Amino acid sequence: FIAVGTMAQTVEKNDSVKNAKKTKEYQFTDVKLLKTTPVKNQSSSGTCWSFAGTAFLESELLRQGKPEVDLSEMFIVRHAYIEKAEKYVRMHGTINFGGGGSTLDVLDIIKKYGIVPEEAYKGLNYGLDIHRHGELDAVLEAYVKAVITNKNRKLTPSWKEGYIAILDAYLGKEPETFTYQGKEYTPKTFFDSLGLNLDDYVSITSFTHHPFDQPFAVEVPDNWAWGLSYNMPLEDFSRIMKNSIDKGYTIFWASDVSERGFLYDEGYAIVPDDKVKDMSDSEKARWTKLSEEEKQKESKEKSKKEKLITQEVRQEAFDNYETTDDHGMQIVGTAVDQNGNKYYKVKNSWGTDNEYDGYFYASEPFVLYKTISYVVNKNAIPKDIQKRLNLK
């Protein structure tokens, strides 16, 4: 079953005939699919984290048997921009500033300010019907950089008002009240009406430079708010993900997608095991002369054995900047390829113009290798791990 971008998946299916779809090298069969809302398009904005976060919470509502709701990504983005500016100014410009964010930003913002449906706040106040934040990001960055130069030798109380005025001009003013399906709400009362307990969600990661079974702030630029993730051994890190999907909970996933094995248009992400040392002398000579584009093309021409991912391999990639915090997405199911290799099915926020209508398949090695962190419902975590983490 391959969901199209115009309708929610309202049932789980496991039909190997209906679910099979071919690419040049790979044939995927969905094993388990969870309920999702339609694929959206972040367009030219660095707001994947908000799109993935709202998709995750929308699926949580569907899992609970509640009606489909389209939550506003830009309401969250607006408040994150404000909080990010405050932190940037207080830190004298020594933290990251831009459109990016982390998984935990979505939960933190909604806890503080509530949420609104998409129809109440689209964030498109600049003459376009798609999100295009190049100018907005540049203007906001120039503004906060001007503030921290402190030309008056004392910051005025007006800088924040001016900053918010920019957001009002580009995204629109925040609604104090709005009407949705015949009822009037504020952002906080609308959130209350959804019945979500945001304390149910925790972030998980796996790195060796901090103690296991303890929370720490993952050191990536977009974790500007210093959100905490529980650090798990790789085996448990993987077990939580598998258990989550098996128990019917989707996953809010932050990953590196800069790998050449990430082939979104073709609909899959893998970690080819292209070790030069495993090649013959003639193969080594030929391979080392190939450009990166030629290597990528050759990798696509045949199904390749994937790299064995260990805790050490994962850590090394993070330590040397081969793994970076690129993208937020939603893991919505599991699948296998024609050789029985296991994959996670992923909902993206780049529209529906790829092989699988906005979805793709990420191999287990890719997920273990390239995941920065992920958010899950704590009830999806195996009981023994819940006990170790003292989750209640």
Residue spans of the language-model regions?
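Active-site nucleophile-adjacent alpha helix/oxyanion-hole segment immediately C-terminal to the catalytic cysteine
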Residues: 23-252, 354-356
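Alpha-helix boundary/interfacial micro-motifs
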Residues: 2-4, 63, 69, 130-131, ...
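Generic detector of short, well-ordered, non-transmembrane alpha-helical segments enriched
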Residues: 4-5, 44, 106, 327
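Active-site signature of cysteine proteases
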Residues: 161-392
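Bacterial Sec-dependent N-terminal signal peptides
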Residues: 1-12
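Blade/loop signatures of beta-propeller domains
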Residues: 13-25
